[in-house]
A protein has these predicted regions:
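Catalytic strand-loop segment that frames the active site of acyl-thioester-processing enzymes
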Residues: 1-29
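Short beta-strand micro-motifs enriched in acidic
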Residues: 3-5, 66, 82
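Hydrophobic residues in beta-strands and at strand termini
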Residues: 15-17, 65, 111
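Compact, glycine-rich, soluble single-domain proteins
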Residues: 26-44, 58
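A generic structural micro-feature
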Residues: 27-28, 53-55, 71, 85-87
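Hydrophobic beta-strand-centered segment that forms part of the acyl-chain substrate-binding groove
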Residues: 43-76
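HotDog/MaoC-like acyl-thioester-processing domains
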Residues: 69-71, 76, 80-114
């Protein structure tokens, strides 16, 4: 599920990462997939806010891994648009499991009008 939380003005996506996305004997979600969940939330919010008229291209992304992300646990990505102009947007994102913050990220996106 993905939705706009209007009260917090943030984009929320629910994921269920499977054991197929792990390393370390199936116990930890690989960092690239963690990054992808955060990136998806940040990018989708730009698309949602533009009513599908903007395609965000991630120019730069910075992810901080705070705790290990486990498989088969509902995982929530939340994002905010910090600033958006005509051609560039800056976003922040967070990833949670069981209400525990497991990773944070920020990105710079080039906006292509479609």
């Amino acid at each position: 599920d993905a939705y706009h939380d209007k009260d917090k003005d943030e984009w929320v996506i629910e994921f269920m990462p499977s054991k197929d996305l792990t390393h370390s004997n199936g116990t930890i979600i690989q960092g690239g997939f963690v990054s992808g969940m955060i990136d998806a939330s940040m990018s989708q919010f730009i698309m949602y806010e533009s009513k599908g008229k903007a395609l965000p291209l991630t120019l730069d992304i910075d992810i901080k891994f705070l705790k290990s992300c486990k498989p088969n646990i509902k995982t929530i990505a939340k994002s905010k648009i910090i600033r958006k102009g005509k051609s560039i947007a800056f976003t922040n994102g967070e990833l949670y499991q069981d209400n525990i913050l497991v990773a944070v990220g920020s990105a710079t996106n080039k906006i292509i009008q479609i």
